[in-house]
Amino acid sequence: MRADLRVRDGLRACADLLKRQSGRIAYAGNSVTAQRASYRVPLHERLVNRFGQAHAAVGAGLGATGAMGTLFTLPELVLRHAPQLCFVECSVGDIGTRPPEQSIGPVVEGIVRRLGAAGTAVCLLHLYRDDSAMGDANPVVRAYERVADHYGIPSIDIGATLARAFDRQQMAKTDLLMDGIHTTAAGAGVVADLIAGALDEIFDAPPRAATAMPPPLHADHFEFCSLLRPSPALVRDPGRCHDGRFRLVYPYLAIEADNAVVLRTGADSIVGLLLVTGPHCGDLALAVDGGVTEYRTWDRWCEGELLRTVVFREPVRPQATMTLEVLDRCTRDDRGTPPLDGGRRLLKLAALMKHTRRGGAGDDGEQRA
C-alpha cells in the first residue's frame, strides 16, 4: 500500500546532508506524535538506517494543541536544537480542537517560515482520526495544503490512505488504533512504514533550483510571535494564585476561580493561551471592550492533565484591556459538569500567546509580565 503524497520541491538536498553527516530530526506534533506507541520511534529507526548516520531524534509532541500550540513552543522544543529536518503533524489536532478556520493557514505559515528561516527542511504529515472526513475533503487539510503549495513543501497524507484502506476492509481499524486516533504498537509500525515509503520518493525527487523564501501567503501570518509568561502582578487578587509545574518541568501560574488576569495588550494582539487542563479546569470568560466571550476548557481527554491551547475566536486587539476570568463552573458537552475533588476550579495558565504583525526585538522568545 502506498501513502498519498505530494512531492512538490522534494527533500533531495536535505537527504544528501543527512547522508553525509549526523544531525537532528525533529518530530513536532500533537498527541499521536507524543504518545508512547508513536510512529516517530520506528520511523526514526528507519531514517537512521537509510542514511547510515546516528541522527538524534528531537521529540516535540504535545497534547491536542493543534498548529497554534506547536508554533508557540517551536523555539523551545525545536529551534534551539537546530534540526536539519522537521516533520510537522498538527492537522489531526486542529480538526479536534476546532480553532477559528481563518487562523489555521496563517498559523501553519508561521511554522513554515520560522523553520525555513532557521534552515530546517519541513515535511507535513496528516494522520488519521475516525470522527472526521480525511484528505482534501477536510477544510483543515486543505488549509495546510495551500501553505505547502505556496512554499513547495512535501506532504504525506496517512489519514486519507488509512481511511481508504478501512473503507475497503484492507485493514482492521481496531488493530491499528486504540481509540480511533492514537495508534497501537502495530499501528505505529504501519504508519511508520507508510511514511518511510513516501519519503523514498520525496528524498529521491530531482532537486529544484534553490530559491529564496517566497513572500507570505497570508497578510496576517504568524512568523513573529512569542509567549507571554504570567506573573502574580497580572492577577486581580495576587493572593489567590500560585506557581506550579506541569509534569515537574513546564511552569504555570494557577489562578483560583472568581479571580482574573487583567492585561493591557500594548502594540501586540493576544490570540489565545497555553494552559494545563485536567479535572481542575473550569470555564473562562474573556472581557474586551465591554463584550464577554466564554470558553470551555474541558473535553473528554481531561481525566488527566494535558498541556493545551485555547484559541480566541477573535484576537484581542492591540491597545486593549482584556480581563480573563476563571469561573467556578465547568461545562462539557456530553455528561454535564465533571466532579471536582475539593477546592475551587483553577486556571493553570502557562502563557498568553502574543502575535506581532511585524518582526521586532523579542519576537523569537518569551517574556514574563
Task: List each language-model region with its residue ranges.
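Extracytoplasmic/secreted cell-surface and envelope-processing proteins
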Residues: 36, 94-104, 132-137
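Glycan-recognition and processing domains
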Residues: 204-265, 274-276, 335-369
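Histidine-centered active-site loop/cap adjacent to the catalytic His
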Residues: 21-26, 151-154, 173-221
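Serine-esterase "nucleophile elbow" of acetyl-processing enzymes
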Residues: 1-63, 73-84, 263-266, 272-287, ...
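Cell-envelope and extracellular/periplasmic
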Residues: 5, 27, 31-32, 59-70, ...
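Beta-strand-rich ligand-recognition modules
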Residues: 279-357
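Extracellular serine-dependent O-acyl
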Residues: 4-10, 123-127, 139-176, 189-203
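Active-site segments of SGNH/GDSL-like serine hydrolases
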Residues: 89, 93, 109-145
